[in-house]
């Protein structure tokens, strides 16, 4: 499916973005292993999250869905039923990596697989420490890649230093650590998103954090709770940048998650000169939430590097679009993790923005962008990457002429209402 966009003149209105994808995944995972019934409200029912829901249904967890409310009757992991067929993770790296960690605590053997794109993404970064904890891993086709057969049980706690800053690896080991003997200690090179730690505490569990060290006691049983999922700041990022670069723009985005480990996008946009206000800030389920008001702004170039990168790794494609409209040279570095996302996002962003006339070059760990540039419409290959598709839809709305986004159905992975919201707020 293709998505065609044209230049717009104004943005206005008040909107809500879909529920946070990371929190939606984790609420299903933790609710499924908690004692009692968990209710999750305003959940993101995207393709990725549906993969996680489908996984637990196949293993015997009772999950009822009505609109955007999910009711889960949790069960002990040792009571998961055997499942001899492949468990299909689709294109969801979050599902694959976190669920490998979780089911390493089950005595049964399971096979996880994915679509052709997920099967290109590395998994040994998760399976290697799981093997150290005692899980049995078998690569059924190629080393490091799905499909993977995993058999767990009798895990032991370890001290593991993450080779890269990755919330998915960290979360997989935390979930395994809940079901092992002894204590698991995880050392991060820099802090990454901490939704898993926050939510485990919301479900009555214990996670200790001290600087870059996370400690998890083994053999914990969580207790059911209610979860209200805030709006996803990674989805809001597209609307924030669009509002900053469209000449006549003022937009309110309501009930957005403002977790400090995810809010790097806000700090960078402020550094670039974006006119933003955070209103009605509050705490829900241990997560900061608020409304964001943003207006058109004259942006200036910045350097994005170091510890802030993990807090905005998913927002770099849309920040690259913002940089094409900023005065000066924007440098993005320390972002080599972009190479193993749904696509190689460094190569994809650079090649597709060049089609639109941007002055941009790739580096080994990021990109360099000279702005401002008058973009021109082009045909964009999204590489089936949802964040690429949405970033270039935004670029197309400030470009002269028509922009066509190929394979735009991938947007449903995280933001099914994206095109509808664009139509609602655009003039």
Swiss-Prot record:
Pathway terms, separated by semicolons: Metabolic intermediate biosynthesis; chorismate biosynthesis; chorismate from D-erythrose 4-phosphate and phosphoenolpyruvate: step 6/7
Enzyme class, broadest EC rank: transferase
PROSITE patterns with a match to the protein in the record: EPSP_SYNTHASE_1, EPSP_SYNTHASE_2
Binding site for phosphoenolpyruvate: 21, 93, 121, 168, 345, 387
Transmembrane portions of the chain: none
Family: Belongs to the EPSP synthase family.
Name of the protein this chain belongs to: 3-phosphoshikimate 1-carboxyvinyltransferase
Organism: Alkaliphilus oremlandii (strain OhILAs) (Clostridium oremlandii (strain OhILAs))
Annotated gene: aroA
């Amino acid at each position: 499916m293709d998505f065609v966009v044209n230049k717009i003149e104004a943005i206005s209105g008040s909107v809500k973005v879909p529920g946070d994808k990371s929190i939606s995944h984790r609420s299903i995972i933790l609710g499924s292993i908690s004692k009692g019934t968990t209710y999750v409200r305003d959940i993101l029912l995207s393709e990725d999250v549906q993969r996680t829901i489908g996984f637990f249904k196949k293993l015997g967890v009772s999950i009822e869905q009505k609109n955007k409310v999910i009711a889960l009757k949790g069960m002990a992991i040792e009571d998961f039923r055997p499942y001899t067929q492949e468990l299909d993770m689709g294109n969801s790296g979050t599902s694959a990596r976190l669920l490998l960690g979780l089911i390493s605590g089950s005595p049964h053997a399971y096979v996880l697989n994915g679509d052709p794109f997920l099967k290109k993404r590395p998994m040994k970064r998760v399976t290697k420490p799981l093997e150290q904890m005692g899980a049995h891993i078998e690569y059924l086709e190629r080393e490091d890649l799905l499909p993977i057969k995993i058999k767990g049980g009798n895990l032991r706690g370890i001290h593991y230093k993450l080779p890269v800053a990755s919330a998915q690896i960290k979360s997989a080991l935390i979930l395994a650590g809940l079901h092992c003997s002894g204590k698991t200690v995880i050392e991060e090179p820099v802090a990454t998103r901490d939704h898993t730690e926050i939510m485990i505490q919301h479900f009555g569990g214990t996670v200790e954090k001290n600087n870059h060290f996370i400690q998890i006691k083994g053999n914990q049983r969580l207790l059911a709770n209610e979860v209200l999922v805030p709006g996803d700041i990674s989805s809001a990022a597209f609307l924030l940048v669009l509002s900053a670069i469209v000449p006549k723009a003022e937009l309110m985005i309501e009930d957005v998650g403002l977790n400090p480990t995810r809010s790097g996008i806000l700090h960078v946009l402020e550094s670039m000169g974006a006119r933003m206000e955070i209103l009605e800030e509050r705490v829900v389920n241990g997560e900061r939430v608020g409304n964001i008001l943003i207006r058109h702004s004259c942006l200036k170039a910045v350097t994005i590097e170091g510890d802030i990168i993990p807090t905005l790794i998913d927002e770099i494609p849309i920040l690259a679009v913002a940089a094409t409209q900023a005065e000066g040279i924007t440098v993005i570095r320390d972002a080599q993790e972009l190479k193993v996302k749904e696509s190689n996002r460094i190569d994809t962003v650079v090649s597709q923005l060049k089609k639109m006339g941007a002055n941009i070059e790739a580096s080994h760990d990021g990109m360099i962008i000279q702005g401002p540039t008058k973009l021109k419409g082009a045909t964009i290959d999204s590489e089936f990457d949802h964040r690429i598709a949405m970033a270039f839809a935004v670029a197309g709305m400030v470009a002269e002429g028509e922009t066509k986004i190929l394979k735009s159905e991938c947007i449903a992975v995280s933001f099914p209402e994206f095109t509808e919201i664009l139509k609602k707020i655009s003039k």
